[in-house]
Amino acid sequence: MKFKQILLPLIAVLVGCSFYSFKGSIPAHIKSVHVSPITNNTIESSTSDVIKYELEQSFINENVLKLLSLEDSDSRLDLTVISFVDKPYSYNIDDISTTGYEVVDRYRIDVKVKVKWHDLKNDLLLFDQEFLGWASYDPQNDIGSDGIDNDNDSFIDDKDDDEFGLPRESAIKIASKQITESIINNIISTW
């Protein structure tokens, strides 16, 4: 009798866990997504290409929804890059004695994207939201050896798998990756 009291709850837990899914609470009829060409309202033209690439890679890697053509898809994502800011983030005061003025030590890139997710089967707007990604970089050094936690993930340089390449381009990629992770998380938790 005691064995049954232990075994039955254990079986119920195991059966419940076997149906766990990373798709969260996406509407049951939505199995696929189409990512429309990204509108870019900024002067930084490469940003939309980087965001689209990172978003498509996230869908492939996370296996949340299948990427399909618009005609075959259950849903559609429309993205607009609405803001791109590349501004000084920190200054090196030590250079004042040499140069007579402060020198920018690091820059920060902020990218803001407006995202609309449409349910094409039921003609509904599932969400309309803005997402922000950012990263800092040292313009004088390789992002993989600058001693900066460029994406605020507690990893620096060779311990961080996304800190490599040209500083500014890498910062754009890091900011884009943050945006796409936020979009995927929002899709998973929409309902």
What are the roles of these predicted feature ranges?
Residues 78-145, 165-166:
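Surface-exposed short loop/turn segments
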Residues 1-16:
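Sec-dependent bacterial lipoprotein signal peptides
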Residues 16-73, 91, 121, 168, ...:
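A structural "domain/chain start" motif
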Residues 3-5, 36-37, 44-51, 78-86:
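A generic short-segment signal for beta-strand/edge and adjacent turn/coil regions
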Residues 22-24, 28, 86, 150, ...:
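Generic structural "secondary-structure junction" signal
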Residues 118-128, 132-191:
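C-terminal/domain-edge helix-coil "capping" segments
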Residues 6, 24, 68, 102-104:
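Residues embedded in well-ordered secondary-structure elements
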